[in-house]
Amino acid sequence: MKIVFSEKCLEYGSWHIEGPERVRRAYEILKEKGYEFLAPGLASEHDVLRVHDADYVRRLKDGLVEDADTPAYENIYEYARLAAGGAILAARVKGFSLMRPPGHHAGRRGLALGVRTRGFCYLNNIAIAVKYLGKPALILDVDGHHGNGTQEIFLGDESVTYVGLHRYPHYPGTGYSSEGNCLNFPLSGDCGDEVYLKTLDEALSKVDLDKFEVVAVSAGFDAHAGDLASLGLTELGFNKIGKKIASLRKHTFFVLEGGYSGENNGKDIDELLKSFEL
């Protein structure tokens, strides 16, 4: 599987927990493993506006989008468009987008489902990629935090089903129960690989896979043991998650969400992708 990456995503936010090192070190590990890399272009404004409100996009361009988690970095709109472009390219080539900033907490107008911050997110990368493809899609969110932005964007969309496995109670405080086409599976902290994998089997059993042409994975690694939303997952756990996703035999792509140890991210991504061809 090809990895989508640009060093431009390392240019900002070195002081922040959602900083470049979490991606830089992962890139180094995956390069050593022999993965092929592709450079993304910017998502077009048309691509962005399929998902996000025009006034929100204007404020993001003007540097007016900021909260306690999510700084108004200089040129952040361009960095966010590049991450969204990475997701689009990954969707096209059935690859993995190793880009930042992440996206699954960003709703149509930024804040989503009553949450007061955007959780390091500016544009919803996976939503932009799914809308770009325009095909029936299962979005599988394995980040340790609930993808409140993704749920808000696709709630009621008959062509998309969102499935989220996440720690609860935990930020953003949403995702306790399912609603319509958004199926949520809250898990206790540090539940471990075995409980997680059983829950993933349960989640997939509730989905009519024949409805979907695409599986889009919000690939967060902060569920790794000791990370911000630890569910006690290990490298072996991510390997088994990858096997389950590969067994679905769909057009599959991955978009990086959280995960704040670059070392763990690189190893977990490699394990996740081992069931897919290099």
Which residues are covered by each model-predicted region?
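Conserved alpha-helical scaffold segments that buttress catalytic/binding sites
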Residues: 88, 99-249, 273-275
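Short, electropositive alpha-helical surface patch
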Residues: 54, 234-235, 264-278
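Metal-dependent catalytic neighborhoods of phosphoester/phosphodiester hydrolases
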Residues: 227-229, 262-267
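Short, hydrophobic-biased amphipathic alpha-helical segments
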Residues: 22, 83, 241, 265-273
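Short acidic/histidine-rich active-site segments
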Residues: 251-258
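A short, acidic, flexible beta-alpha connecting loop/helix-capping segment that sits on the rim
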Residues: 9, 223, 258-262
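Metal-dependent C-N hydrolase catalytic cores
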Residues: 1-130, 134, 186, 204, ...
